[in-house]
């Protein structure tokens, strides 16, 4: 395998300082070398266990330390989760992500988590989970169940991290990513723009991700969703061009990774989202609820896809599953119906 050069902070900073149009041009060139620019990977995210998290992440309404009005819920029943996955697939998603508000999963919950993964995989969907810190044995059990992706974000640079989270160290996050990788699961890891970080911190986050032994296959870039009751509720809004720059730099630094527009899309107008796609974003979360915060409704996403000439990307599915292509095409051509997946109703 050819040696992959490591990025330096000065190199990343230079990218952030480029004139915006030059940066977008470079990012689009890199993107076209590795991906079909008209294809966007579509995922659906479901909160399978909501609230009462012991962590103190200052941006998160699921923390038990903040009064956000969010009601805590127990781990969902397996069949409830699988029914949501069926609706997600019917609406055109190809990856189903399951998130639980835990510091780490309990051993007693592992059999249910394994059943969820197996059930989602049996539908021909890719399966993704985000459950907090994993042990080696837990990562291996999820891998054996067929889990495709595990999400565990670094959130920000190592230098700024302590201003946002104190209940989990940066090294713990890196260790979990290593255990996931060693178990044979693909890594999904990114961060948040708008925490109060500097451009140098954004560069530091992307530096950490790109310089992992193997960069994440999926890199979600979130725009802070300010939730009343959290310590960051009064943070300044993120400048759209700053966010677009972050997407573009991520694309250049991790040319073969999927760069996902995640939380915060509800706050973006169509023009900002279009520029993010131009900057190299090629994955979105689809549907109107992203764990506990709003996300654009499917029909708005499909309308934007039509305007921009974008298509949902297909993924490898199980043999005998011939409905996927038809459903993806139908999702693009059919106006909004009651059958569209609506996570907010769960």
UniProtKB/Swiss-Prot annotation:
Ligand binding ([2Fe-2S] cluster): 97, 128, 188, 260
Pathway, per record: Cofactor biosynthesis; biotin biosynthesis; biotin from 7,8-diaminononanoate: step 2/2
InterPro entries: Aldolase_TIM, BATS_dom, Biotin_synth/BioAB, Biotin_synthase, Elp3/MiaA/NifB-like_rSAM, rSAM
Amino-acid positions noted as binding [4Fe-4S] cluster in the UniProt annotation, renumbered to this chain: 53, 57, 60
Alphabetized UniProt keyword annotations: 2Fe-2S, 4Fe-4S, Biotin biosynthesis, Iron, Iron-sulfur, Metal-binding, S-adenosyl-L-methionine, Transferase
Iron-sulfur found in the keyword field: yes
Names of the cofactor(s): [4Fe-4S] cluster; [2Fe-2S] cluster
Catalysed reaction, written as an equation: (4R,5S)-dethiobiotin + (sulfur carrier)-SH + 2 reduced [2Fe-2S]-[ferredoxin] + 2 S-adenosyl-L-methionine = (sulfur carrier)-H + biotin + 2 5'-deoxyadenosine + 2 L-methionine + 2 oxidized [2Fe-2S]-[ferredoxin]
SUPFAM superfamilies: Radical SAM enzymes
Pfam annotation, one family: BATS
Top-level enzyme category: transferase
Radical SAM core domain span: 38-256
Cofactor note: Binds 1 [4Fe-4S] cluster. The cluster is coordinated with 3 cysteines and an exchangeable S-adenosyl-L-methionine. Binds 1 [2Fe-2S] cluster. The cluster is coordinated with 3 cysteines and 1 arginine.
Coiled coil: none
Quaternary data: Homodimer.
Record family assignment: Belongs to the radical SAM superfamily. Biotin synthase family.
PANTHER family according to UniProt: BIOTIN SYNTHASE, BIOTIN SYNTHASE, MITOCHONDRIAL
HAMAP family: BioB
Function: Catalyzes the conversion of dethiobiotin (DTB) to biotin by the insertion of a sulfur atom into dethiobiotin via a radical-based mechanism.
Protein's name in the database: Biotin synthase
Originating organism: Escherichia coli (strain K12)
Gene this protein is translated from: bioB
């Amino acid at each position: 395998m050819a040696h992959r050069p490591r990025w330096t902070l000065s190199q990343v900073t230079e990218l952030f300082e480029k004139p915006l149009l030059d940066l977008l041009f470079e990012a689009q060139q890199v993107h076209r070398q590795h991906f079909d620019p008209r294809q966007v990977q579509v995922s659906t995210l479901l909160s399978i266990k909501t609230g009462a998290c012991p962590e103190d992440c200052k941006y998160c309404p699921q923390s038990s330390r903040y009064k956000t009005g969010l009601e805590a819920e127990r781990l969902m029943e397996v069949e409830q989760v699988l029914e949501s996955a069926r609706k997600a697939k019917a609406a055109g998603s190809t990856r189903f992500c399951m998130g639980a508000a835990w510091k780490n999963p309990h051993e007693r919950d592992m059999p249910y988590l394994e059943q969820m993964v197996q059930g989602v995989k049996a539908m021909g969907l890719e399966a993704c989970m985000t459950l907090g810190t994993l042990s080696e044995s837990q990562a291996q059990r999820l891998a054996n169940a067929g889990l495709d992706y595990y999400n565990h974000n670094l959130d920000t640079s190592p230098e700024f991290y302590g201003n946002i989270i104190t209940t989990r160290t940066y090294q713990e996050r890196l260790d979990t990513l290593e255990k996931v990788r060693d178990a044979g699961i693909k890594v999904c890891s990114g961060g948040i723009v708008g925490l109060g970080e500097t451009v140098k911190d954004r560069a530091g986050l992307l530096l950490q991700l790109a310089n992992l032994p193997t960069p994440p296959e999926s890199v979600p870039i979130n725009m802070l969703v300010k939730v009343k009751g959290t310590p960051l509720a009064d943070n300044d809004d993120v400048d759209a061009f700053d966010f677009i720059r972050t997407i573009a730099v991520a694309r250049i630094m991790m040319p073969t990774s999927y760069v996902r527009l995640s939380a915060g899309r509800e706050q973006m107008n169509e023009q900002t989202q279009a520029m993010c796609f131009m900057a190299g974003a090629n994955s979105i979360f689809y549907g109107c609820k992203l764990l506990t915060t709003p996300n654009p409704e499917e029909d708005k996403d499909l309308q934007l896809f039509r305007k921009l000439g974008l298509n949902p990307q297909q993924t490898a599915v199980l043999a005998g599953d011939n409905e996927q292509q038809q459903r993806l095409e139908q999702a693009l051509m059919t106006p909004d119906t009651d059958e569209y997946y609506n996570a907010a109703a769960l």
